[in-house]
Curated annotation (Swiss-Prot):
Task performed by this protein: Specifically methylates the N4 position of cytidine in position 1402 (C1402) of 16S rRNA.
Top EC category: transferase
Reactions accelerated catalytically: cytidine(1402) in 16S rRNA + S-adenosyl-L-methionine = N(4)-methylcytidine(1402) in 16S rRNA + S-adenosyl-L-homocysteine + H(+)
Alphabetical list of PANTHER family matching this protein: 12S RRNA N4-METHYLCYTIDINE METHYLTRANSFERASE, S-ADENOSYL-METHYLTRANSFERASE MRAW
Keywords: Cytoplasm, Methyltransferase, rRNA processing, S-adenosyl-L-methionine, Transferase
Lineage of the organism: Bacteria, Pseudomonadati, Pseudomonadota, Alphaproteobacteria, Rickettsiales
Gene coding for it: rsmH
Protein name (record): Ribosomal RNA small subunit methyltransferase H
Record: residues binding S-adenosyl-L-methionine: G30, G31, Y32, D48, F75, D96, Q103
Organism field: Ehrlichia canis (strain Jake)
């Protein structure tokens, strides 16, 4: 079961109001959407590129008739999606970035190093390139660079060399094979909290799904869609994502961007909002979550 992270904090900042329209740009299992719909007599446009999430939409649509619209698409396409639904402005957009618990827990999706399955990692099956294409065709130098840049893995060159050596013998087809390759050259950390394959899997997933480009484009499009008083809330899970969110928010708050967009933005929370100790105890996957928010003025 997917447990929404920083749900209470997100709701307090968004402060849903009757008659307003909000966007859940990363619908998933619908946790944020359900909470927003329960908080006020408002409407939610829910977006997710993963077609497997439609089952959760159907359940919410029955419970909240005529108050939720669902679109299978990437959130970088948020502007086109809303214009297609004849919506030009909204009052808030929430992003919960990264892979969901549902995707991690399904071995067939190929996201998890702890469950053996096909090496896929695509959030949308419409993408033609999956993780197996990456590890079996990309050069050693590029593999090393991606794992270092997107995963912060200091052993990226050793891992890349091990991948190349393995694929000379056979095609790398499963998550189990890739995890084993990484473990062959990287030992478990002293605190035992981080699996040796964590950073490599993260980096490849980000590359496959173009997650950082999607994030930047999605936030900028969302900023252009907000009514005055509208908010953008982003929950991210690793430092690379958070740096991008921080950079974009800082840019949106600058005078130069305000003049270009003919509007202004201000930070809602100058300090990062993090999960409480209690939330981390109840949901260990929340431990690295960071929330940032911005207001259109």
């Amino acid at each position: 079961m997917h447990t929404p992270v920083l749900l209470k904090e997100m709701l307090e900042i968004l402060d849903p109001q009757d008659g307003k329209i909000y966007v859940d740009a990363t619908f998933g299992a619908g946790g944020y959407t359900k909470a927003i719909l329960n908080a006020a007599n408002c409407k939610v446009c829910a977006i997710d590129q993963d077609k497997h999430t439609s089952i959760f939409y159907e359940e919410l649509a029955n419970n909240f008739p005529n108050r939720i619209h669902f679109f299978i698409n990437k959130f970088s396409q948020i502007k086109q999606v809303l214009l297609g639904a004849q919506l030009e402005r909204v009052d808030g957009v929430v992003f919960d970035i990264g892979v969901s618990s549902m995707q991690l827990d399904d071995a067939n999706r190929g996201f998890s190093f702890s469950k053996n399955g096909p090496l896929d990692m695509r959030m949308s099956t419409s993408n033609s390139i999956d993780a197996s294409v990456f590890v079996n065709t990309v050069s050693e130098e590029e593999i090393a660079n991606i794992i270092y840049q997107y995963g912060g893995e200091k052993y990226s060159r050793k891992i890349a060399k091990a991948i190349i050596n393995f694929r000379k013998k056979k095609v790398i087809e499963t998550t189990g094979e890739l995890a084993s390759i990484v473990r062959s050259v990287v030992s478990r950390s002293k605190n035992h909290d981080i699996n040796p394959a964590t950073r490599t899997f993260q980096a490849i997933r980000i590359w496959v799904n173009k997650e950082l480009q999607e994030l930047e484009q999605g936030i900028m499009c969302a900023a252009d869609l907000l009514n005055p008083g509208g908010k953008i809330i982003v929950v991210s899970f690793h430092s690379l994502e958070d740096r991008i969110v921080k950079m974009i928010f800082k840019s949106l708050c600058s005078d130069e961007i305000s003049l270009k967009l003919n509007t202004g933005f201000q930070l809602i929370n100058k300090k990062i909002v993090r999960p409480s100790f209690e939330e981390i105890l109840n949901n260990p996957r929340s431990r690295s979550a960071k929330l940032r928010a911005i207001l259109k003025i």
